[in-house]
Amino acid sequence: MSHPVENVVAAENTEKRPTNFIRQIIDEDLASGKHTGVQTRFPPEPNGYLHIGHAKSICLNFGIAEDYQGLCNLRFDDTNPVKEDVEYVDSIKQDVEWLGFKWEGEPRYASDYFDQLYGYAIELIEKGLAYVDELSPEEMREYRGTLTEPGKNSPYRDRSIEENLALFEKMKNGEIAEGKACLRAKIDMASPFIVMRDPVIYRIKFATHHQTGDKWCIYPMYDFTHCISDAIERITHSLCTLEFQDNRRLYDWVLENISIARPLPHQYEFSRLNLESTLTSKRKLLQLVNEGIVDGWNDPRMPTISGLRRRGYTPASLREFCRRIGVTKQDNMVEFSALEACIREDLNENAPRAMAVINPLKIVIENFSGKEMLTAPNHPNRDELGVRELPFTRELYIDQADFREEANKQYKRLVLGKEVRLRNAYVIKAERVEKDAEENITTVYCTYDPDTLGKNPADGRKVKGVIQWVSAEDYLPAEFRQYGRLFTVANPGAAEDIHQVLNPDSLVIKQGVVEKSLANAQPEKAYQFEREGYYCADSKDSRPDHLVFNLTVSLKEGF
């Protein structure tokens, strides 16, 4: 299924600094003197692992700060202690650093500002702009109205300032049960924007907070916290995705009605990243983890940054992907192949080459004995990466798919009675086969031409095919995890039941062999396994006595 791609380009953009509507706004603000510098922030909620959509926001906020010699804060929007955890805080820090960015100073937390936020809530109450409401959640939904019908005022809306202050104090002191009261901004229940219909700005939660412990039992809502945190940190340009476009009205209302330093920050919205065949809902990703459908948040099939990292994606490839898709106000579905193209280009340029046989078939070179050490370049275009030794022995492994007893002319591999070249080695000819009781081929007996190392046969005969191989006498066993798309549809988020759109073949595990040079393959180290694909050593399970390689991406699109 085809989808429009959001600003994806094939050719490399040579501009040093990308251009988009946000950067144009910043240029105008600096030129007019509205701001003398740029301060951005990346404000994740620590209730899950960061995913590819967050990478776009990270690259945008930190990238703008870098390009304008400004600063970017890392601020944790930690206003819901029930769903947040230090595990997520640590993983977010790690992901941002891994992508190659450094935040200004120490990480910040919205909870750092809880005292100030409480003070601003008191100020709104004293101005008659906030009140304590005791409607039940069900009643509040009923009073809120719909997109076509205005809401109606709560019977508690016109309480006196003194009563509201006293009730808010009781909320703070833990004297009111959870769910029995909240603090609401007094704006307009008839507003065409539901977000402005007296939104809740504080609620009661008797939960231990990972930063503040049990100091508080009332917690500010996102819309109240976010804008004030931006103002406290002197953020000049607050960048959010389009779903927060209506929230900008509340962002501005809060700041305009409290006594906080000017100039005030301004919020700008851009399109979120919608990636084909990918789920980015934290709730649904958590479901995959909790149900054991995937091997944790960093499963290589997950769209999390840690999952992509474990699969073999590099920081440079993700940054390049984010650069290519650009920043617009239009929501589009980005084809997954655009992401794959970025890592494929990166690894083609940087990954050393090696040989692996994923479905081994033994061949015996009948006119060869002993062992000959051959050499092969680690990269065809980068001499500085050096060479490696390949032991050529009487018994070798080739892939089962690279031999047929009979084949047409389009099959340019080993065929009974015909020749093929072994990569970085000799031309061999298949002479006969040995089969088991079920007629499966177990061994192919061959001869080799000793005069064909690094050159064509002297008599001018044409040998067109080239296949990879590994010594059957000097090799390392390896596990190959061949990852595919986790879902069978382009938009799994729209599915009523994600179980119905899971790809049963999203992970296929094979046991094969690799050349001995990979004995010390380090976690996350990427290789091009010639004719097979780009793989990396698994960071969790691979070790010297049990090598595990993850398929990062195929050699060509569509394979």
Swiss-Prot record:
PROSITE patterns: AA_TRNA_LIGASE_I
Annotated catalysed reactions: tRNA(Gln) + L-glutamine + ATP = L-glutaminyl-tRNA(Gln) + AMP + diphosphate
Positions of ATP binding: E45, P46, N47, H51, I52, G53, H54, A55, K56, S57, T241, R272, L273
Keywords noted in UniProt: Aminoacyl-tRNA synthetase, ATP-binding, Cytoplasm, Ligase, Nucleotide-binding, Protein biosynthesis
EC annotation from Swiss-Prot or TrEMBL: 6.1.1.18
GO BP term, pick one: glutamyl-tRNA aminoacylation
Keyword Transport attributed: no
Subcellular location: Cytoplasm
Matches recorded under Gene3D superfamilies: Glutamyl-trna Synthetase, Domain 2, Glutamyl-tRNA Synthetase, Domain 3, HUPs, Ribosomal Protein L25, Chain P
Alphabetical list of Pfam families matching this protein: tRNA-synt_1c (PF00749), tRNA-synt_1c_C (PF03950), tRNA-synt_1c_C2 (PF20974)
Short sequence motif named 'HIGH' region, residue ranges: 44-54
Residues holding L-glutamine: D77, Y222
Ranges spanned by the short sequence motif 'KMSKS' region, renumbered to the chain: 279-283
Molecular functions per Gene Ontology: ATP binding; glutamine-tRNA ligase activity
GO CC annotation terms, alphabetical: cytosol
NCBIfam families per UniProt: glnS, PRK14703.1
Family: Belongs to the class-I aminoacyl-tRNA synthetase family.
Quaternary organization: Monomer.
Name used for this protein in its record: Glutamine--tRNA ligase
Organism: Pasteurella multocida (strain Pm70)
Gene: glnS
